[in-house]
UniProtKB/Swiss-Prot annotation:
Gene3D superfamilies: Aldolase class I. [4Fe-4S] cluster 2 binds at residues 257, 260, 274. It catalyses: GTP + AH2 + S-adenosyl-L-methionine = (8S)-3',8-cyclo-7,8-dihydroguanosine 5'-triphosphate + 5'-deoxyadenosine + L-methionine + A + H(+). This is GTP 3',8-cyclase. The keyword Ion transport does not apply. Monomer and homodimer. Belongs to the radical SAM superfamily. MoaA family. Keywords: 4Fe-4S, GTP-binding, Iron, Iron-sulfur, Lyase, Metal-binding, Molybdenum cofactor biosynthesis, Nucleotide-binding, S-adenosyl-L-methionine. It comes from Listeria monocytogenes serovar 1/2a (strain ATCC BAA-679 / EGD-e). Catalyzes the cyclization of GTP to (8S)-3',8-cyclo-7,8-dihydroguanosine 5'-triphosphate. Residues 7-221 form the Radical SAM core domain.
Amino acid sequence: MQLLKDKFGRVHDYIRISVTDRCNLRCVYCMPEEGLTFLPHEKVLSKDEIVSFMELMVKFGIKKVRITGGEPLLRTDIVEIVRGLGAIPEIEDISITTNAMYLAKKAEALKEAGLTRVNISLDSLHADRFKAITRGGRLQKVLDGIQKAEEVGLFPIKLNVVLIKGQNDDEITDFLRFTKDKDINIRFIEYMPIGHAGTSWKEKYLPLDTIFEACNEAGYEYEPVDSIRGNGPSENFRIKGAKGTFGVIHPVSAHFCDSCNRLRLTADGYIKACLYWDEEMNIRPFIQDPVKLMQLVQKAIDNKPENHEMALKLQDEVQSNKPTWRRMSQIGG
């Protein structure tokens, strides 16, 4: 089997497929309050295109798929997409990232179709604050979605918490306490300058050392834990005696580019080899032309930078030669 390897020796076996750029929320770190101009439906990859693409990609070593958006559960055919991917025997793991507004309704059907596990965005445990950060989200719907995911066996369940200075950084201990009674992995993620103009993001950025300081202040003893299924770049820990775990993902202060194994496919059919790099290859016209398609995929990988240059300098400045122009919802979170 010919593997997808870049010039730095990184083998790519994981792809994140955005199935829509649409979302029913407007999270402050993902989309402007006024929203975005969404792709016309005919510009979005169809179920058959997604499945055909993956039937080819598995021949080159891709074996893990994460479905993203926008909000992927807005796709009326999301269960059929999962079922189509689940029918490809070489795919070992199918996961989804969701805001969970519709997860309670769809979790059982998704599990039956072949979904392995779920990541859920949850940036506050206070209903009013959650509504403010998401610009309209209902916390109880997320909690119901978590419960349903537990019931149907979508494990491990991971909760993605973007740490935002002045908005939810006083809830760190609450999230840590959440892991004591639930077998859930809470992942604290640094606020990233994706698609943001200027340097205003720095006003909301907090280094993740804050998490460990909160543990110490609360008197929580914690220890590293072994790899969690699909853990990716997260460094994971467990508070002694807790059922669940917590992790930290720091793409800004300590990037993990040297071990990056992922590609991204946008909802409109562009391959991105790096989240924070503008270069994209339009593969949609060639989904039925495997030779040309794989030439483009390999070209994207060949041009992948050694790192995304989003690391902080001493003065907390971002160095970036080619920052991405897309918002996170347009790339696939």
